[in-house]
């Protein structure tokens, strides 16, 4: 089902039922409003809903039942796993891998090459419930990695190449090249075997 003025690039594979351009609150009841913009070679699997005013680059892929809210911008060669939720007003870079059942809240910034494991929860409200102007999602800098089922508190910055161990609860910034582990997480030096320096996206 399509709403709004959508623009989908060449060679897109869209497996119904998919909803493109669903109206945000300000456009409910309107028939004339912006849709989504999706680049070439996209694969969008059944059950997914992408709201209006979302911009997605080339070679995007998503699993089933993915929700992407309004005014989110996603770069090239990025994938989002099954049943993940990306709330509005967020930015996601190139070559990002978001695994299944991840929650990305409003006002989150995810840079190029980031990897987010399954079941990760990012948060944006330190003392809920807070009004929208106060919501501040995490900032995940280039090539940072988050292990499965970790929780990242509002406004936390993961530096370039930083890593978060599975199941950790991150309550303070993680410097570039460091690892956070535990609940609450403590910052340590990166193990010698380390994660990768960059993510090599498939052609």
Where are these regions (language model features)?
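A glycine/serine/threonine-rich, flexible loop-to-helix segment
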Residues: 191-202
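Structural signal for interior beta-strand "rungs" in well-ordered beta-sheet cores
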Residues: 1-14, 18-181, 186-187
């Amino acid at each position: 089902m399509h709403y709004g003025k959508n623009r989908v690039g060449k060679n897109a594979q869209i497996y119904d039922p998919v909803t493109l351009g669903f109206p945000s609150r300000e456009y409910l009841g309107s028939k004339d409003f912006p849709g989504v913009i999706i680049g070439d070679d996209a694969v969008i699997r059944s059950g997914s809903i992408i709201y209006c005013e979302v911009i997605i680059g080339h070679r995007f892929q998503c699993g089933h039942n993915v929700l992407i809210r309004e005014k989110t911008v996603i770069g090239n060669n990025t994938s989002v796993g099954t049943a993940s939720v990306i709330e509005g007003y967020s930015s996601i870079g190139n070559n990002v891998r978001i695994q299944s059942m991840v929650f990305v809240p409003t006002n989150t910034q995810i840079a190029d090459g980031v990897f987010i494991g399954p079941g990760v929860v990012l948060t944006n409200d330190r003392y809920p419930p807070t009004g929208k102007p106060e919501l501040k999602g995490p900032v995940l800098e280039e090539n940072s990695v988050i292990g499965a089922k970790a929780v990242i508190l509002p406004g936390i910055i993961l530096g370039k190449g930083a890593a978060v161990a599975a199941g950790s609860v991150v309550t303070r910034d993680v410097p570039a090249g460091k690892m956070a582990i535990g609940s609450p997480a403590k910052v340590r030096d990166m193990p010698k075997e380390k994660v990768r320096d960059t993510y090599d996206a498939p052609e």
